[in-house]
Amino acid sequence: MGLDYILVHVTYNIPLAGILTLVYWPFMTRLDWQKISTLVIISLVATIPWDSYLVRHRIWTYAPNGVIGWTLYDIPSEEVFFFIIQTYNTSLVYLILTRWLVLPMYLGTVARKETLIGASILLLAISVGLIALCFGDHFTYFGMIITWAGPFLLIQWVFSSGFIIALPKLELMVSITLPTLFLWTVDTISINQGTWTVEAPTKLGVQLWSGMDIEEVLFFLITNIVIVFGLVCIDYAIAMATCELVQSPQAVQSFPSYFRVLARFVTNKYHPDKQFVASLRKAVDRLAASSQSMYMGSAMFQGPFRIDLILLYSFFRVADDLVDESQDTESARMIIEQCDQLLEAKFSHPELFPFSPGYQEAKHPAPPELIAAIDSLPVSRLRLEHLKGLIEGFRTDLTFSAKPGSFPFVTESDLDTYAYHVASSVAASMLGLVVHHFPDHQFAINVFLRRRVVDAGERMGQTLQYINVARDIARDAAINRVYLPTTWLKQQGLGPEDVLASPTDSRLELVRDRLLDRAEFLSASAREEMKFLPDEVQGPFLATVDSYLEIGAALRRGMRPRTLDDKLRLPLGTRLWVAYRAMAWRK
């Protein structure tokens, strides 16, 4: 009886599990626990018979003073725990690295050729393993590894090869490589200390470095591949269920249970719409490139709700860019009117869009990206009046160029109204989606509570817009726009014309601080109501708001973009910490 193997866990495996859990805990969902539990159960069921054979036939042996003596089918309890902790740690590494991925955008990849080639290679490897077992002796352990793990990899590849190929390679490679390197190190130390041994008559006798047999190198590599591919298969099933639900025209969207998702994956004939997947991919790329706060905020959400949000955010981004980048006032006005008409058509005849009645008679065709963005909107789960608010905000923007020298923001009330139209529309639309995706939550059921929370959400939206104005004083001045209330400017001895002439005037810092004060006040006044949102929404919503508030804090510290044309962007580490803090506070 000894504690050597236990000390390996206490020294290496358990601390790593603790660190990974601490890192991912704020973002952990019930679905994540279910995925990990599934892999742990499969690993135990698949490994115990195999490992029991290895121990009973003395392919693996343990020092008598290295284990405590408790066994399961002759397997030391420490070894059984190892299967659990390896699966847990590798799963967490995968979850951390792939949290930001929008899984449905990787659907639809046809990989028949790659599937056939991969399956052929795996069948060949299994055949080699069987031949090695027939030879026995020094080929025994090598053959046992290949013939045991090969069929699992073959099944995973046949079911999910297209999805595996479509996923980002870096995340998959790192998810496999990091745990493997760690376990190679732990295994080398343990073998050199004599905690366990691969017996000489059953191994090839080739060591890649001192104490590390080539079979052990292969074992840890192939088991981590099996774990990661197992998680990918589950994510494939979840992505299919998510895509099917998002494409449904039904207003109420309840995500099916975990086991139902897996069952439908095996039996369902659903094929994702390639056009929808392509539109989703473009929406994700657009947000990642032009709206980091919204993109990172969306990564905190999960499932169909996240997809609806991305499509909504993408529409706002497309419309805003088209208006801002118009060549002249008339072009911008045309874009706004086209957007208004297309929204009316989409909400009136979603099944006919974009060939709705009246659309084909338009004299000037709308930009294809605007049509695509509106066509992707989940209109059965949105309200037209919320999106119309954005249109009103665009019309306000036009007054700058329609009347040179005209500055529509005279008082704080004017800015409040504009912020309500532009940003509160986003918040109200988002909270409207919550009703459809969480129909059994008190927020959806209690109308009076919902009205209270939506009011608070709209104030949160105004918070974001105030910070945008404070951040973009110079950028707006470059296109002859001043969103600062004239009454505020006069108190500093300035006018809108002075802002256009010198957007870096030191006196504007007091106006900027006032904008940030207003943003912080609006945020503080609305934060308490956010606790009535579903847990799945509350943390991510606050994480998005807090990322904007952090931009405000950076502005107060004097942080500025490198050039006047750029937006102030927070370092990645800061954005991750803000998201972590907000999600941890929710937990």
Curated annotation (Swiss-Prot):
Task: Please state the pathway this protein functions in, per its UniProt record.
Answer: Carotenoid biosynthesis; beta-carotene biosynthesis; Carotenoid biosynthesis; phytoene biosynthesis; all-trans-phytoene from geranylgeranyl diphosphate: step 1/1
The main location class comes to membrane
The keyword Isomerase appears for this protein? yes
Swiss-Prot/TrEMBL catalytic activity:
all-trans-lycopene = gamma-carotene; gamma-carotene = all-trans-beta-carotene; 2 (2E,6E,10E)-geranylgeranyl diphosphate = 15-cis-phytoene + 2 diphosphate
Matching entries from InterPro entries are given as: Isoprenoid_synthase_dom_sf, Lycopene_cyclase_dom, Squ/phyt_synthse, Trans_IPPS_bact-type
This enzyme's EC code(s)? 5.5.1.19, 2.5.1.32
Membrane found in the keyword field: yes
* Chain segments carrying region Phytoene synthase: 243-587
Map out region (Lycopene beta-cyclase) in residue numbers.
1-236
Matching Pfam families:
SQS_PSY
Q: Where in the cell is it found?
A: Membrane
UniProt topology in membrane: Multi-pass membrane protein
- One cellular-component annotation, GO: membrane
Q: Which keywords accompany this UniProt record?
A: Carotenoid biosynthesis, Isomerase, Membrane, Multifunctional enzyme, Transferase, Transmembrane, Transmembrane helix
Swiss-Prot/TrEMBL GO biological process terms: carotenoid biosynthetic process
Q: What does this protein do?
A: Bifunctional enzyme that catalyzes the reactions from geranylgeranyl diphosphate to phytoene (phytoene synthase) and lycopene to beta-carotene via the intermediate gamma-carotene (lycopene cyclase).
Name of protein? Bifunctional lycopene cyclase/phytoene synthase
Q: Which organism is it from?
A: Aspergillus oryzae (strain ATCC 42149 / RIB 40)
